[in-house]
């Protein structure tokens, strides 16, 4: 089982605040996510600028595309994104359109499982050639005190068994990682737990050490 990658989510409102994070920890992570908040605040230039600074890193545009899949994904890929996200409630043709464009750029598409979705949809994504999904505990759910539970672990295992590469996100803390041991997680996303740490560098390194211990 290969080691899960570590992704930092830049859900900053401005590039200046995003750079405060990347200057510290870009070299400690595998994937740099231009979060939805930053995508809205700064547009695709955020993707372009971060990829120019860190060409050796995977840069994800978390656009959460809901419609106009080909147009919006092309905007992201032309800005040199490696991956883009499509929201789970989008029509299957939106996901297919985004994937078609991704292939032109040797990129990839992730389905963001935020909110309601069904296993029938999951099978449609697999049939369409989608390989990646993001299992998401929403920011609002976290704020309401909703913790990771057995239902989450069961769903993640089932998605993995279907052949998906599963990314896990949603207020992920270091102490949560053992919950997922034994599952071939593709990526763990840490946002505020790294960005807002007293030492973001040490926080990122602790995540990497824990991943190596649990999956190594």
Swiss-Prot record:
Binding-site residues, Mg(2+): 33, 62
Sites annotated Transition state stabilizer: 64, 67
Biological processes per GO annotation: 'de novo' pyrimidine nucleobase biosynthetic process; L-ascorbic acid catabolic process
Quaternary structure note: Homodimer.
Known function: Catalyzes the decarboxylation of 3-keto-L-gulonate-6-P into L-xylulose-5-P. Is involved in the anaerobic L-ascorbate utilization.
Family stated for the protein in its record: Belongs to the HPS/KGPDC family. KGPDC subfamily.
Protein name: 3-keto-L-gulonate-6-phosphate decarboxylase UlaD
Species of the source: Salmonella typhimurium (strain LT2 / SGSC1412 / ATCC 700720)
Taxonomic lineage of the native organism: Bacteria, Pseudomonadati, Pseudomonadota, Gammaproteobacteria, Enterobacterales
